[in-house]
Every structure is written in structure tokens, then in C-alpha cells.
């Protein structure tokens, strides 16, 4: 059985491949998400939704990422890190049922596995700053399971 971690890894790979080849997003989605995750429809559906939402949100996510990636232009960030930051930012903005801590932790762990030795720390710093800023702006709209851990974010935002 596949997990949401598997889904996120496949979406990261699909975003990366799509960006590197300027390819057909639907073809990439089919090859890199639908086929590997075919055995678990709920995981596949989550992956497809995350991929599509990340593409739709990319311009907004890039602006947010650049604001918090001190001294980094979006195109200079390692491609895998960029894909992960876009995914995590999209989850924070658009996935009401996903707790922010899950989005952040998953991005960090996937960065450690697939990117450079320093990527986990870099992704952590950027996405943490994004998380606190979105909270301060009232843009974290979480419901149900997505509310898990929100009290910790509120405490951290109050102390910064």
C-alpha cells in the first residue's frame, strides 16, 4: 500500500521532470504518478490533486518562496528543493485537511533523501518562515485534521 509520503515523492519527481523537460504535464502525471500509485486510489488521487494544485499555485508560491529565501532568486534554488518548496507552500495554502507540521516535515525529509546534504536545513528554514508569515497574515485556513498543531504555530508566532 502506498502512503502520502510516496505520493509526495512522486509529485516532487513529476514536478522536477516537468520543469526540466518543459514537457506535457498530463503525460508526466500519467507516467510518474498514476502508474506507480495505481494500486491505492486514495493516494493516487491525493498525488494528482497535489500536482495540479501546485501547478496552479506556482506563480504565487514562487513569490512567497522568494520573499523568504534570503538572497535567493527562485531559479537559483536547486530544482528539487524548488519543487519541494512549491509543493509544501501549496499544501499550506490549499490543503485545509493537512496539518502544517506534516507539510513542513514531509518536505524536509524528502529533501534529505533526494537533494543535497544541506537541502534539509535550507528547506526547513524557508518553509518555516513561510509558515509563520502565512499564519501572521491569516492565510492558514485549516479544518479538521488540518488544525492539529495550530496551537504550537500560534505560540511560535506570538513569540517572534
Curated annotation (Swiss-Prot):
GO cellular component: cytosol
Signal peptide: none
GO molecular-function terms, A-Z: RNA binding
Spans through the membrane: none
Entry keyword Coiled coil: no
Presence of the UniProt keyword Membrane in the record: no
Record key words, sorted: RNA-binding, Transcription, Transcription antitermination, Transcription regulation
Entry similarity comment: Belongs to the NusB family.
UniProt cross-references to PANTHER family, sorted A to Z: ANTITERMINATION NUSB DOMAIN-CONTAINING PROTEIN, N UTILIZATION SUBSTANCE PROTEIN B-RELATED
Name of this protein: Transcription antitermination protein NusB
Amino acid at each position: 500500500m502506498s502512503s502520502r509520503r510516496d505520493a509526495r515523492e512522486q509529485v516532487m519527481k513529476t514536478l522536477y521532470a516537468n520543469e526540466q523537460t518543459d514537457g506535457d504535464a498530463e503525460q508526466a502525471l500519467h507516467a510518474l504518478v498514476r502508474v506507480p500509485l495505481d494500486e491505492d486510489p486514495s493516494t493516487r488521487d491525493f498525488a494528482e490533486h497535489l500536482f495540479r494544485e501546485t501547478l496552479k499555485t506556482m506563480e504565487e508560491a514562487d513569490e512567497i518562496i522568494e520573499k523568504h529565501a534570503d538572497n535567493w532568486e527562485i531559479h537559483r534554488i536547486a530544482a528539487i528543493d524548488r519543487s519541494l518548496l512549491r509543493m509544501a507552500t501549496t499544501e499550506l495554502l490549499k490543503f485545509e485537511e493537512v496539518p502544517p507540521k506534516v507539510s513542513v516535515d514531509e518536505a524536509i525529509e524528502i529533501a534529505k533523501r533526494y537533494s543535497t546534504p544541506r537541502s534539509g536545513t535550507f528547506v526547513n528554514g524557508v518553509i518555516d518562515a513561510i509558515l509563520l508569515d502565512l499564519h501572521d497574515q491569516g492565510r492558514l485556513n485549516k479544518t479538521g485534521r488540518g488544525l492539529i498543531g495550530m496551537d504550537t504555530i500560534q505560540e511560535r508566532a506570538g513569540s517572534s
